[in-house]
From Swiss-Prot:
Belongs to the metallo-beta-lactamase superfamily. Glyoxalase II family. It comes from Pseudomonas aeruginosa (strain ATCC 15692 / DSM 22644 / CIP 104116 / JCM 14847 / LMG 12228 / 1C / PRS 101 / PAO1). InterPro entries: Clx_II_MBL (IPR035680), Glyoxalase_II_hydrolase (IPR050110), HAGH_C (IPR032282), Hydroxyacylglutathione_Hdrlase (IPR017782), Metallo-B-lactamas (IPR001279), RibonucZ/Hydroxyglut_hydro (IPR036866). It comes from the Bacteria. This is Hydroxyacylglutathione hydrolase. GO terms for biological process: methylglyoxal catabolic process to D-lactate via S-lactoyl-glutathione. Its EC number is 3.1.2.6.
Length: 258
């Protein structure tokens, strides 16, 4: 049984910590800062960091990799098409890799960056570590990829089982939900989610992980085929957007300035 906890980093990052209590081994996802992981390891001296999983090359996701590799000798896994510090295993789309006894399938999900990958573990309750591609009620900015690429990546993730747990790496949920409400003010599920997320943050609790089912009902970037979302995108752009990709592009540009 793998336990998954969040180690907060910087202002709003989460480093996901996977723990196998039987073997006393652990793994981390996107350690942008080594210090939270080092502190956890110091408080758990009988545990060993065996693996470091990286989704993309941005500093707030890889800044702690080299130090943790030097400290622990952990294996570093990351996208083949990006420059990842101390990488031992370069991963391509469709490959499978075992971490703490869990087999993860690698998805290439370009958009936020061109080489971005996600780690998917199919199970009774599937797990998805998706970096800055799919957020709770949102998606990552397009620093390198195109709207069409990101739309395709998100559609791929949206097609995963509805109960897939979504582990993204930023606490952006409330700001994303505010934008989502601007897109779909009459979405009752969205209003309910906003109220629940507000209660969680008022108690300084995290809003993650999410689930694919929740994203499908409340994330505007996964709802670009819905009439309500298309209508708002058409109003925003002043023209008829004929494809889901065009609707997505309008929403993403709007969110960038929201």
């Amino acid at each position: 049984m793998i336990q998954i906890d969040a180690l907060p980093a910087f202002n709003d990052n989460y480093i996901w910590l996977l723990q196998d209590a039987t073997s006393r081994r652990c793994a981390v996802v996107d350690p942008g800062d080594a210090k939270p992981v080092e502190a956890w390891l110091a408080a758990h001296p009988d545990w060993r960091l065996s693996d470091i999983l990286v989704t993309h090359h941005h500093h707030d996701h890889v800044g702690g990799v080299a130090a943790l590799k030097e400290l622990t000798g952990a294996r570093v896994l990351g996208p083949a098409n990006e420059k990842i510090p101390a990488r031992d295993l370069a991963l391509e789309d469709g490959e499978r890799v075992e971490v703490l006894g869990l087999v993860f399938e690698i998805f290439h999900v370009p958009g936020h960056t061109l080489g971005h990958i996600a780690y998917y573990h199919p199970a009774e309750t599937p797990l998805l570590f998706c970096g800055d591609t799919l957020f709770a009620a949102g998606c990552g900015r397009l620093f390198e990829g195109t709207p069409a690429q990101m739309h395709h990546s998100l559609a791929r993730l949206a097609a995963l089982p509805a109960n897939t747990r979504v582990y993204c790496t930023h606490e952006y949920t409330l700001s994303n939900l505010r934008f989502a409400l601007a897109v779909e003010p009459d979405n009752a599920a969205l209003r309910e989610r906003f109220e629940e997320a507000t209660r969680l943050r008022e108690r300084d609790r995290i809003t993650l992980p999410s689930e694919i089912s929740l994203e499908l009902s409340t994330n505007p970037f996964l709802r670009v085929s819905e009439n309500s979302v298309k209508k708002k995108a058409d109003q925003r752009s002043g023209q008829q957007n004929r494809t889901p990709e065009e609707v997505f592009a309008v929403l993403r540009a709007w969110k960038d300035q929201f």
